[in-house]
Swiss-Prot record:
Cited function: Adapter protein that binds F-actin and dynamin, and thereby plays a role in receptor-mediated endocytosis. Plays a role in the reorganization of the actin cytoskeleton, formation of cell projections, such as neurites, in neuron morphogenesis and synapse formation. Does not bind G-actin and promote actin polymerization by itself, but excerts its functions by interaction with other proteins. Required for the formation of organized podosome rosettes.
GO biological process, one term: positive regulation of dendritic spine morphogenesis
Family of this protein: Belongs to the ABP1 family.
Descriptive protein name: Drebrin-like protein B
UniProt source species: Xenopus laevis (African clawed frog)
Region of interest called Disordered, as start-end residue ranges on this chain: 202-288
SH3 domain sequence ranges: 317-376
Membrane topology: Peripheral membrane protein
Domain ADF-H: 2-133
Amino acid sequence: MSVNLSKNGAALQAAYKDVLDEKTKTDWALYTYEGNSNDIRLAETGDGGLEELVEELSSGKVMYAFCRVKDPNSGLPKFVLINWTGEGVKDARKGMCANHVSTMASFLKGAHVTINARAEEDVEPESIMEKVAKASGANYNFHKESNRGNEGPQGPVGSVYQKTNAMSEIKRVGKENFWAKAEKDEEERRIEEHRRANVEKDRLERERKEREQREAEERERRFRERSKEIDGHRKQQEEVEKQQTVPASQRSVNPREMFLQKERSLPESGSVSAQPEQFTASQQEEENIYQDATENQNIYEDTPQEDPVYETGVAEDSGMCARALYDYQAADDTEISFDPDDVIIQIEMIDDGWWRGVAPSGHFGMFPANYVELLE
């Protein structure tokens, strides 16, 4: 966007004319922007020359100064235009204001020397006056040569020495020390911030690694526990399947044979009368052994055509009872069959691995002990 000189045009023009007019004490005028806009306003005017002007330049602003000085060679008034861009101005603002320099030069026309400055060393009064002297040197020599024939005896050569302003010098040195200290402090601050940022970064990285390590260890622990649990279930299932598939005659402990041997060794009761031809030998032996129990409980009738049948309900006189955990199919007529959750009553623990009892179907026989759980 272009610079706006019309909003405060009257004040801008009046200050400019005061500097041009040798009859006024005002010998410098300073211009700047209103905030971040492109509107130019009058910042300050004064009559203290370059020494006073440079004290008003701000490191955080873009400013334009127009100053009247006296040519050290000819003593004639000369005009200096200073385009000031402080070191603290943002780069985007610098780029925008750079396009306004030519417009300001056209407005503050008549300058013999133009200076583009960014730091205090660019606007030292001695340096500016040297540039003014060099700019007017050719014209000055021309005028001197043209008037040399009319001059009388030459007097002492005048000196261009200017008395040092003590207060101005103190201020200048103080500002130099101030800015040097400020730059040093700023550099130390940046170094400290960078160090703190690195420390914080290292801390976060260390915490992240520790957290990831803990999570990995926890996952490994859970994995081992789960694997152990799965292996236990698998072994248990394999054992159950093995028990189901191996015939009773091939099991490592065959309590059924032991049971049959015990039955054969018992003496036959003489009170039992001869049975009809329908009774098998195994049924006769079984009835001889359990005659007393069956008579007391009245579980089955003395009919040779049917197998003994027992009540399946869990009554007070049902003896030891158990609930089936798995299904089991009898290998022969000396064993009983049952399904999961069936209740087996009148259990006798004849062996660590094999018991016998009455199944829900009413049949009495042996079954594997690890297929059931006892009921309280």
